[in-house]
Amino acid sequence: MPALILPLIEAAVHWPVRGALLGLDLGTKTIGVAASDPDRKLATGVETIARKAFTADAARLLALAAERTACGFVLGLPLNMDGSEGPRAQSTRAFARNLSRLTELPIGLWDERLSTAAVERELIANDVSRAKRAKVIDEHAAIFILQGALDRLAALRRAE
């Protein structure tokens, strides 16, 4: 049965209480990957995958999920500033649908508006060279996306 693809808050219901999550920032040329600890408090960078064919990309993501015994994915959804979905969001949803056919791990979609811009500002503020930024931007964006999702889930748990 294909994995569920839901907004983050709805997907969280289908994840066990503990277990790592993988955060993904889909770019046209790369996929930034981050992972949480099993308690879902901290996101750390894993790697930047140079995109090839979907099957190769998916195989690498599923291998990373297995290595970390991840129980789900958090996929950054690039919404427009007005909240609408443009071509990049549609492409991300298509990627999620294709990935869902290969795994049963639920996929949570999380608004990633301005994540890359925020990460780029932070890297510039830390004097990271343009060449180095280009190599790490997607992985850092994945960390930003996943940490935002983890913080939101933690806030919801505290409010219960």
Curated annotation (Swiss-Prot):
This is Putative pre-16S rRNA nuclease. The keyword Hydrolase applies. Belongs to the YqgF nuclease family. SMART domains: YqgFc (SM00732). Keywords: Cytoplasm, Hydrolase, Nuclease, Ribosome biogenesis. GO terms for molecular function: nuclease activity. One of its GO terms (biological process) is rRNA 5'-end processing. Pfam families: RuvX. Transmembrane segments: none annotated. It comes from the Bacteria. Its EC number is 3.1.-.-. The keyword Iron does not apply. Its main location: cytoplasm. One of its GO terms (cellular component) is cytosol. Could be a nuclease involved in processing of the 5'-end of pre-16S rRNA. It is found in: Cytoplasm.
